[in-house]
A protein has these predicted regions:
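Asp/Glu-rich intrinsically disordered low-complexity tracts
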Residues: 3-4, 8-12, 16-20, 24
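An N-cap/entry alpha-helix motif that binds or orients negatively charged groups
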Residues: 19-116, 224, 228-230, 241-285, ...
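Short beta->alpha linker loops
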Residues: 79-80, 157-161, 325-326
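Generic secondary-structure signature for well-ordered alpha-helical cores
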Residues: 80, 90-97, 151, 198-203, ...
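Short, conserved beta-strand segments within well-ordered enzyme catalytic domains
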Residues: 96, 111-113, 122-126, 152-154, ...
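Glycine-rich active-site/cofactor-binding loop and its immediate structural neighborhood
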Residues: 119-158
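Alpha/beta enzyme core
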Residues: 130, 144, 169, 183-350
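A gly/proline- and charged-residue-enriched helix-loop-helix capping module
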Residues: 148-190
Length: 350
C-alpha cells in the first residue's frame, strides 16, 4: 500500500511538473533544429546520393581529377621533403574522441569563447589563399558557406577576392583577417590593409610570422607554377588605394627607354619555351609586373622581429593572433603580447 501510494505520488508529481512547465521538456530534451546533424537527415531525406562523398579521404582524389595538376599540387603540397607535414598529420590522427554515455546531450553545446566573444563553433575556417585556382566562386563561396554554418572565416592576404567583396558575401557572419606582413618600407600599405579590414567587419588580426618569403615547395618548383605571377592571389593588394599609388610611383620612376623595355618583354616571352606559354605571358603583360610588385611587398625576404609587433599594435586596436610555430626562446618575447599559434608547415619544413 505504502509503495503504491509512493508510486502514485511520484507519477502525480511528474505529471504536474510536465503540465506546469511544458517548456522544460522542449528546452532540455528536443534536439536543436539547427544542429549540424540535420545535414545527415537531409541526405537521407533526399533519397539520392550526395553530389560529393561524405568521406574526407576521397576528397583528395576527387580534387586531383577535377582541376589542373599544377593547381592541385599548389593546394596539396607542403615545404621541403614534406616530412613535417606528414608528422603533423600523424600527430593529429593520434587524437581520439572519448564520448560519455548516459549524459544529457540532446542539446549539445559546442560553443566557445574567444577574445570575449561567443562563437557557435569551436572550429574556424583557416586562411586559405588563391581559392580561385580550385573554384571560380573563390573566397566569396567560402564566405557564404561560413555565414550559413555560423563558422568564423579567416581571410588570407593572398585571396583572389578583395576584402570588400568577401565582407559583402559574408554579411553578418564572423570574420578575421590574416596578414602577410608587408616589408617595413611599406608600412603605409600595411596600415591601409588593416584599416580596410577593420572598416569591413573583420574583428581579429591573424599575423603569419614564418612567411616573409615564399617557401621552398618542390611541387610548385617542379611545375614552375606560382599563381601570384599571373595575378591570382593579389586581389587584396590590387584593390588597395595605397598599393595602387605605390605601384604607379614605381612605374613613373622607371627611366628605361622604350627599346630597353621591349627587349625585356622579348626575353620574358622566350622563357616558357613554347608558343602557348608565350601567348599566356603576352595576355598577362600588364598584370605580371603589378603582381611581381605586390609579391615583392608581402614576400620580400625582409624579416620582422618582436619589436615590430608594437607597430601592429598601433595600427590594429582589436585582438592579434600570432600564427607561427614557437621555439622556447620565442616564448619569452611573445609573452609581452597576447596571442595563440598554429601552423601547418606549408611554407617551412623541419
Amino acid at each position: 500500500m505504502a509503495d503504491d501510494r509512493s508510486s502514485n505520488m511520484a507519477n502525480d508529481s511528474s505529471s504536474n511538473t510536465a503540465n506546469d512547465n511544458p517548456s522544460v521538456t522542449t528546452t532540455l530534451y528536443e534536439p536543436d533544429p539547427e544542429s549540424y546533424v540535420q545535414f545527415q537527415r537531409e541526405i537521407y531525406g533526399s533519397l539520392r546520393k550526395p553530389k560529393y562523398s561524405t568521406k574526407p579521404s576521397e576528397w583528395e582524389a576527387a580534387a586531383r581529377n577535377a582541376i589542373p595538376l599544377a593547381n592541385f599540387l599548389y593546394v596539396f603540397g607542403a615545404a621541403s621533403s614534406e616530412s613535417t607535414h606528414a608528422a603533423n598529420r600523424s600527430a593529429f590522427e593520434r587524437y581520439r574522441l572519448r564520448p560519455s554515455m548516459l549524459v544529457q546531450a540532446t542539446r549539445r553545446n559546442m560553443s566557445t569563447e574567444l577574445f570575449g566573444k561567443q562563437y557557435k563553433s569551436p572550429l574556424l575556417i583557416a586562411p586559405i589563399g588563391v581559392q580561385e585556382i580550385v573554384h571560380q566562386d573563390a573566397e566569396e563561396a567560402t564566405a557564404r558557406a561560413a555565414k550559413a554554418l555560423k563558422v568564423p572565416m579567416i581571410l588570407s592576404t593572398a585571396a583572389t577576392r578583395s576584402i570588400e567583396q568577401v565582407a559583402k558575401a559574408n554579411g553578418d557572419g564572423d570574420r578575421w583577417f590574416q596578414l602577410y606582413w608587408p616589408k617595413p618600407q611599406a608600412e603605409e600599405f600595411t596600415a591601409s590593409l588593416l584599416s580596410r579590414a577593420k572598416a569591413n567587419g573583420f574583428s581579429v588580426l591573424v599575423v603569419t610570422l614564418d612567411t616573409f618569403q615564399i617557401g621552398w615547395r618542390p611541387n610548385d618548383l617542379d611545375e614552375s607554377y606560382l599563381p601570384f605571377i599571373w595575378g591570382q592571389g593579389c586581389q587584396v593588394g590590387f584593390s588597395d588605394p595605397v598599393f595602387q599609388r605605390m605601384y604607379e610611383k614605381q612605374q613613373s620612376e622607371d627611366t628605361r627607354t622604350v627599346t630597353e623595355k621591349l627587349q625585356e618583354v622579348w626575353q620574358i616571352l622566350k622563357r616558357p619555351g613554347s608558343l602557348s606559354g608565350a601567348a599566356k605571358v603576352l595576355s598577362h603583360a600588364s598584370i605580371i609586373p603589378k603582381a611581381m610588385f605586390f609579391t615583392g611587398l608581402v614576400a620580400s625576404g625582409n624579416y620582422r622581429d618582436w619589436n615590430d609587433l608594437q607597430t601592429l599594435r598601433r595600427l590594429w586596436s582589436g585582438p592579434i593572433v600570432l600564427k607561427v610555430r614557437y621555439n622556447c626562446m620565442s616564448c619569452g618575447y611573445s609573452s609581452q603580447i597576447p596571442g595563440d599559434t598554429n601552423r601547418g608547415r606549408r611554407p617551412q619544413g623541419h
